[in-house]
Amino acid sequence: MFVNAAITSTAQREFRSTAAAQRLSLDFLHEYVLGNYRDLYAATLALDVNQLNAAMVVTNLLRTAREASREQRAREGRLIAARLRTLPPQRVYGVFRDLRRLGINNRRTRAIVRDWVAARPDPAFDAVKYRRSLSVAARHAHLPLPGEVGTALFAWRRPRRYETPILEAWRRAHYDQRALYELPYTVAEGLAAQHGIDRARFLSGIAPRLTAGERLRLQGSAVRHKVDGVAMDLATAPLTRLASYALSLPRPERLRRRDELTGALRAAARRAARRQAGTWGRVVAVLDDSYSAAGSGTKRRRPLAVALATHYLLEALAADFTGLWLHHRGDPLLVHPVGATGLGMRILDALERGPDRLVIVSDGWDNDPPGQAAEVLRIWRTRLDPDQHTSIVHLNPVYDADTFDVRRLADGVATVGVRDAEDAAALVELARFATGRAGFDELRRHLADRVERFLDDQEAVS
């Protein structure tokens, strides 16, 4: 339950629940698992939980350190340090701001902050891009800052000139428009507004410094302002992000760029499949393109993007693949959310093909008619395939705030949360724990093994 929530929920509005309901449900679940299963709670840092929940786990473990034994604190410290190394800087600085707000400033916390900041490859870059966050961390943990970084944070007007190039560019950018194009996009954007620079001109100038994520977010703005230099690099984009981008395009443009987009999606799927490509045998997928797959205004088309990305990933993993959408027929690139969620008949269509694996990607709200999918799966499991020759897994990309879990289709069918399709192969490994057939002791052993592998991998590269 908790792992499913920690993978899928970002405490944002979903199709059927508000952001407030998502946050309240998630906060309660964190507190419950932390209070009753602390070791398992800490072990989730070694799993593929999303960034928000990893940050919440780190904060909660440090906030309640007095409740842990010395052995627990030592293990948690290693897990926290290892997980912070995998998170993007803005998320880690967010954790540090929360620690300051909560007044958590013990020696262990200061050491974790100090070690993470000391390991940053370019403190001067952080002093520009994450200026306020780094200053908060430095004050809170009493950090010694190298060279001109401390001056730039706390007395930036004093020097007439900085020796560090990025700090000097940042200083000059306050009065020289040309200098702001040497800065990170998020910093340069605010200074460009102060200088009154035209948006199209700014995007053209800053394009070479954009990260892959920034390029993706700016696609719409670049089209509106007719800027060509912000094109997204499809050859390196992650699979789910690429699917989201494809679905954001109008259908006529998807049709016009069909070969380019399909080729990029298949290449990304092969990268995600790696050595498992072609090893899954005969696979059939039932993919939800009902209206609820449109997501929310905050997570626009996210469930549909996960389904589309999973289609291409399973195509790469399988020796023989068939993808069955609830409503759409034809090229999956042209799919769009429409209609009710009638899973039952499509599951029947899938099972008739006799697959080795059946993968269902849906939010689980089977409503056309309600409960048909559960009945189909029950009869299949109990009467037609009691020996389970066909493996059935339900991947659900939407957290249900009311049940503190992702919504399940049927008893005895593994349901696991999924955020990025790239993680689907690893999530199938966790599916046996979702049905209840694997015991609690086996779960503990599995998590202990994952923790050791995670720590060994992270400490080997640190």
Name each model feature, range by range.
Residues 1-285, 292-296, 324-462:
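Long lumenal/extracellular ectodomains of secretory and single-pass membrane proteins
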Residues 280-281, 293-321:
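…and closely analogous acidic/polar surface helices at protein-protein or active-site interfaces
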